[in-house]
């Protein structure tokens, strides 16, 4: 594993970052506030725009394997959430969820060997190894998973050919 810096909003910075690698893990995310200082560009759909830039850079560099973090309540996982979880997320985080939908569509249409990982609410807790992973897991407002466990799932998909072309919800066990 080698961590390489790049700016997802500057397409030209991504070529050198992805070239020569076997796979790319995309963990873009944004807070829903319009003035998110870390994002630096209020209103910019960083997940979808950044992922499209990343896909273009990967295609140009010949890198085939992509693992992307999305979110529970995106795509078909919206239908596996226990009420009122999907409704709450889609209402309170509409801009973020819409951006994630566009991001996932770009990944699915990329022609790359992709996996989408959809964690529930992430915490800063330690890695426990106690997770559930699957395309149709039930989840709710109380569902949690640590960032460390979600990262371990992402890394695990790299050696799992069955995860290619799959969108997987991740929850703590």
Question: For the regions a protein language model found, what residue spans apply to each?
Answer:
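SDR active-site strand-loop-helix element
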Residues: 25-28, 66-72, 117-119
């Amino acid at each position: 594993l080698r961590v390489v810096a790049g700016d997802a909003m500057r397409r030209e910075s991504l070529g050198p970052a992805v070239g020569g690698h076997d796979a790319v893990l995309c963990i873009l995310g944004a807070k829903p506030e319009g003035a998110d200082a870390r994002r630096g560009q209020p209103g910019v759909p960083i997940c979808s725009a950044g992922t499209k830039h990343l896909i273009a850079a990967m295609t140009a560099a010949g890198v085939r394997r992509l693992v992307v973090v999305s979110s529970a309540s995106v795509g078909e996982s919206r239908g596996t959430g226990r009420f009122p979880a999907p409704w709450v997320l889609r209402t309170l985080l509409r801009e973020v969820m819409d951006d994630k939908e566009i991001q996932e569509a770009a990944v699915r249409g990329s022609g790359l060997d992709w996996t989408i990982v959809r964690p529930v609410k992430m915490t800063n807790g330690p890695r426990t190894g106690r997770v559930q992973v699957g395309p149709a897991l039930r989840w709710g407002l109380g569902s949690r998973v640590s960032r460390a466990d979600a990262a371990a799932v992402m890394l695990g998909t790299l050696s799992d050919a069955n995860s290619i072309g799959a969108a997987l919800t991740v929850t703590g066990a």
